[in-house]
């Protein structure tokens, strides 16, 4: 089941990004005391009382050229569309403002759970000022201080109480679930339609015409699949495009439900920065990945074109060195018959468990071939290694001191594991732990 989504909404300069950073536990938003400074990373994962969720900072949209009320309305509408629960942030020092009331009117029509939080209540004497906020119509307000971390626990308790009840996954374990992600108009829906042989998803040449995620069940050569098509992710740009940044939340939900993610690239447009960001989301989530270059029929080619493209992809997607690449055309169905066997292969690799004895032999041989470097007179000593998880395959290396496990040596061990076992198409994790 996909994680619940929580959106932080409020007029500019009420402290949304400070609260966002407090909740996720790291400083990922740029925070200054100027309205509209939040940019770039506007969502993250968080956890409260053992429950994980995704959280959005709606201040991440750049609407500086738009009228003030349009900025507020766009933020609120994004939250309404994407979130399961909305945290409505106000400023206790300034009281209820006209802008707060405008936000409240929009949120009130949403029928989504709203938790009203009054920020910048930094001392007990200010608590008498919270009663005016009952007029916004969302019940008990929660006084908090983002800068000092006060009151956030009570607020998050209220948020967690509104999370949807967890449902059992509706598909059997042996069903392979995969999603297609990419920028708008790279041809995700066209690929899906071509695979199915029927128009199950409405396709248009206008970017962003596929809404939300669409599950399609399919059986091929006796294997059951669930295909999850997502709305495309548009690069940051004009005001009407800026809300498309939030389609990443739709993609994240699809990614979380998937075993395999097909990262679709438009051959006509080449590789864009947004392609790399999108692929990074799937990699960070630990999903098996296939890179699909679509619209291969639409470009001029010679006998070297595939090699040139492959080298370029490997250079620009260095973090996806494990991902196979397929050059296809949804229009002509070129190489589409390769996709299902490849999906099966990377799905199997994603859930592969290896024998502990074979694994430790591989690690011992690797250490003998390339001993770890010295650090301040100490050398990393590896005692044994065990696989602790699949999807993705995750290995814990028990050592004398995890601080001595340099990133480069961790990568070296990962490469040796990949050489020994069939992990094509899947990320693997190597974690150093101190032996007790």
From Swiss-Prot:
It comes from Listeria innocua serovar 6a (strain ATCC BAA-680 / CLIP 11262). One of its GO terms (molecular function) is GTP binding. This is GTPase Der. The keyword Plastid does not apply. Residues 352-436 form the KH-like domain. Gene3D superfamilies: 3.30.300.20, P-loop containing nucleotide triphosphate hydrolases. Keywords: GTP-binding, Nucleotide-binding, Repeat, Ribosome biogenesis. GTPase that plays an essential role in the late steps of ribosome biogenesis. GO terms for biological process: ribosome biogenesis. PANTHER family: GTPASE DER (PTHR43834:SF6). Associates with the 50S ribosomal subunit. It comes from the Bacteria. GTP 2 binds at residues 182-189, 229-233, 294-297. The keyword Oxidoreductase does not apply. GTP 1 binds at residues 10-17, 57-61, 119-122. NCBIfam families: GTPase_EngA, small_GTP. The lineage of its organism: Bacteria, Bacillati, Bacillota, Bacilli, Bacillales. InterPro entries: G_ENGA, GTP-bd, GTPase_Der, KH_dom-like, KH_dom-like_a/b, P-loop_NTPase, Small_GTP-bd. Residues 4-167, 176-351 form the EngA-type G domain.
